[in-house]
UniProtKB/Swiss-Prot annotation:
One Gene Ontology cellular component annotation held by this UniProt entry: cytoplasm
Subunit structure: Monomer and homodimer. Interacts with small ribosomal subunit protein uS11. Not a structural component of 43S pre-ribosomes, but transiently interacts with them by binding to uS11.
An annotated Gene Ontology molecular function: ATP hydrolysis activity
Gene Ontology BP term (one): ribosomal small subunit biogenesis
Parts forming coiled coils: none
Protein's name in the database: Adenylate kinase isoenzyme 6 homolog
EC number: 2.7.4.3
Catalytic activity field: AMP + ATP = 2 ADP; ATP + H2O = ADP + phosphate + H(+)
Cellular compartments annotated: Cytoplasm; Nucleus
InterPro entries, sorted: Adenyl_kinase_AK6 (IPR020618), P-loop_NTPase (IPR027417)
Region (NMPbind): 39-62
Amino acid sequence: MSEPEPDVKPNILITGTPGAGKSYLCERIASELKFEWLDCSKIAKEKNFVEEYDEEYDCPILDEEKLMDHLEPLMAKGGNVVEYHGCDFFPERWFQAVFVVTCPNTTLYDRLKERNYNEKKLASNIQCEIFGTILEEARDSYKSDIVFELKGETKADAHISIKTVKNWYRMWKRK
């Protein structure tokens, strides 16, 4: 494989169940690696990339097509840390690494309760974490050698996860 140009940076996806610790990691990883942090939920709200509102789960439903049209030119440049709680609709070509943040369901429950999730939404997200739905989705959507699991329960876990991503980046630059 040819060496990447010195100023070329990969795109990294950080995904996982809401409340697992994605934002904390993304903020620090983007800062330390000098990447752009693209929080897809925030972008969707700001740009109104919403198809409708789901009353049952008390949340907007993402217009994936509009989001992807918006992200395409940014992804072409590289150097992005993309955050979202799903991953199966992003083009595989966009990412050189996919990190899935996981968290024990008891910790996740407490975090989602703090966010005032309704009972149905809370139960759905806890079930998603228990069954490893996002990790399975990532493994089904991307090559296995670019999918990694990170722990998001504690600050110590987060520091280890940040080191893991930074080490991955160092190795990627050597290819």
